[in-house]
Amino acid sequence: MDQADPREIQTLQMYLNEYGQQIELMTQQLSMIEQQRLEGTAAIETLRALQENADGAVLLPIGGGAYLRVKVLDAGHVLVNIGADVSVERATADAVGYLEDRITELEALAKKVAGSVEQLQGQATEISRRLEAAYRGARQAQAGQGGSS
């Protein structure tokens, strides 16, 4: 790149900023997906432990680090949110299967989003390299003009 075009530098900078924003959004998405996966795993562990617990007593968090010891009336059935704030009653074993399927879907989604993040990072690196070359060209052109005056 002999002569650096200011418009090209500006365009590259704009692309780099956009890629950075997209990477940030996708990274946040990955965090939310991971949080949902962890919640699903915890729910499965809780349901399994409840099936093994003879007296049906559990600790119910009520906030502020406080818990109530409560008895579960029907450990054989669970209300499961299936989306759009709709919950359905399922047998505990069916609920566990549903949650396991949801976790599998979340893991596949996380893998897809992580791949997109990796691809965007590669593109951002390439743009950053081109931008650095354009800046170098601009400095060299400026140094050449300054020496000829």
UniProtKB/Swiss-Prot annotation:
The keyword Mitochondrion does not apply. One of its GO terms (molecular function) is unfolded protein binding. Keywords: Chaperone, Cytoplasm. It is found in: Cytoplasm. Its main location: cytoplasm. InterPro entries: PFD_alpha_archaea, Prefoldin, Prefoldin_subunit_alpha. GO terms for biological process: protein folding. One of its GO terms (cellular component) is cytoplasm. Heterohexamer of two alpha and four beta subunits. Belongs to the prefoldin alpha subunit family. Molecular chaperone capable of stabilizing a range of proteins. Seems to fulfill an ATP-independent, HSP70-like function in archaeal de novo protein folding. This is Prefoldin subunit alpha. It comes from Methanoculleus marisnigri (strain ATCC 35101 / DSM 1498 / JR1). The lineage of its organism: Archaea, Methanobacteriati, Methanobacteriota, Stenosarchaea group, Methanomicrobia. The gene is pfdA.
